[in-house]
Amino acid sequence: MGHHVTLLCGGWPDAPPRAVLDGIEVHRVGTRATFPFLARRYWHRHLADANFDVLVEDINKVPLFTPTWRSPVRVGLVPHLFGGTAFQELAAPLAAAVWLAERPLPLIYRHDAFEAISESTRDDLVRRGVAHERIRVIFPGIDTDHYTPDASVRSRTPLFAYLGRLKKYKGVDLVIRAFAAANIPGAELEIAGAGEYRSELERLSRTLEVHDRVRFLGRIDESTKIALLRRAWATLFASPKEGWGITNLEAAASGTPVIASNSPGIRESVRHGVTGYLVPHGDVAAMAERMQHLSNAHELVEQLGAAAREFATEFTWQRAAEETEAHLREVVTIGGVR
């Protein structure tokens, strides 16, 4: 598209402070923890005079409050806002800091445009006081050439999978409880991902006496991930809130149905009864019932999987790029939002 893109982000030990990746000029400052506190100073010292047309801020956990910077027209890119869910994962002081940092968004960003990755995130912004007309919803894409179906490798016996971080707020405990409640003969649950909540989840599987049918795979590589998505009869997702269910779309592109909580963000990545099923968040019995239903109807797994694959093809990175470019051009042309 002929654009010049500069990325300012956090670094990690031994990471070079500057790099050019796929034509993008990358500036790394601080670490994941310190970046929010160092970004402003770095910007004003090294980038503020670079004559950018637009500054896009990824508003994630701790806002940078770029409207207080010396900067061009701005767009706030919002995956999702934590709100009260921060208290489910973080210690009270840290959760309170995240919650408080999000509170002044409508005031401080009152002249800025926003790009939300889901309608749920847009609605969250509106509830907090951001005008609806200042928000453009642009869904992320999925590489459907990378994630592809292969029904020939589907597990012969019911196999369910969870893929994602093992964090308390992700609701993986609900997935294990539902699997235990379903009590499907010969069924297995494979959990892929890492996190400090793993030991507690392993204890839960022992308490529920399903530890011999629940496998914790840890962090897996991409090829193993693709194989798991293809083998599973359904993936399970029970988070109370997400910006977007990217794992659900990866499963869909792989021809695998999804059983997920009817939660903000997640509900937009599953078409209930078409590509999988949505159940009330926290309703273990409802999730277990859907698992039982699929286990008794293998042909339904393939039917939902085929529809899921078709659904996933609607979400391309080309479309996301074109919509984002159009939005940024519009904001630059009108000089932001007033």
PLM regions with names:
Residues 257-260, 270:
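Short hydrophobic beta-strand element within catalytic cores of glycosyltransferases
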Residues 120, 141:
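Carbohydrate-associated surface elements
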Residues 202-220:
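Nucleotide-activated donor-binding/catalytic signature segment of Leloir-type glycosyltransferases, i.e.
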Residues 115, 151-179, 190:
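Conserved donor-binding/catalytic core segment of Leloir-type glycosyltransferases
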Residues 94-114:
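Membrane-proximal helix-turn-helix segments that form the acceptor-binding/catalytic region
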Residues 272-273, 277-284, 293-298:
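Conserved acidic donor-binding segment of nucleotide-sugar-dependent glycosyltransferases
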Residues 219-220, 227-232:
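Short alpha-helical donor nucleotide-sugar binding micro-motif in glycosyltransferases
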Residues 240:
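Aromatic "clamp/platform" in nucleotide-sugar-dependent glycosyltransferases that forms part
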